[in-house]
Amino acid sequence: MTEGLQGPAPGERPQPSGRRNAQGIRIDPEMEAVHDPRRTALSALVQNEPGVLAKISGLISRRQFNIESLTVGTTTNPETSRVTLVIEEPEPGIRQVEKQLAKVVNVISVRELGDDAIRRELVVLKVHGEEPDKVNAITDMYGGETLDAGPRTITVQITGDEQKIDDAIDAFRQFGIRELARTGQTALARGEEWTTHAEEERYERTQVRQ
């Protein structure tokens, strides 16, 4: 008589731990964990071609990611542009944004910037001009520049990090802000660190050719 397979009885065998879905597939604890949203900036190097920004913004809107600002501008290479996105998402959402951006054909490289990255914004404010001396004093205090001054309105610009811009706007409220235009963040990695790996690789190739 043939003996059966050796080993413990089914009820005595070790069972995989963790929850499973209706199909019996184990649920990854990391995906189930509750992650608090955090605010961060992503820098993407993209090909300078028509429609790239539309593809990126369309991807973000379809996935319903919480994006706070998006800026774009050319780099030292006229064939590429830098897109800086500020998002507020839980950790899995941030990683998902990175993955989805990397899948866009025209995106060359994308990475999350560290907390020490250099970030700057610009705000243009038009305020009532009844107290020009006080307006000028506030402008000077924030290292700003007067762009236009007339008997009824004064327009100034301020550049700086997010906190400085927020503080400046609050300071100008006493005069009555008629209009305001604020850019999103643009950012670069600090020191000798490259903002994207693709830029570092391109620089190294040019050095070899020289």
PLM region descriptions:
Residues 2-45, 49-81, 86-210:
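Long, contiguous binding/interaction regions
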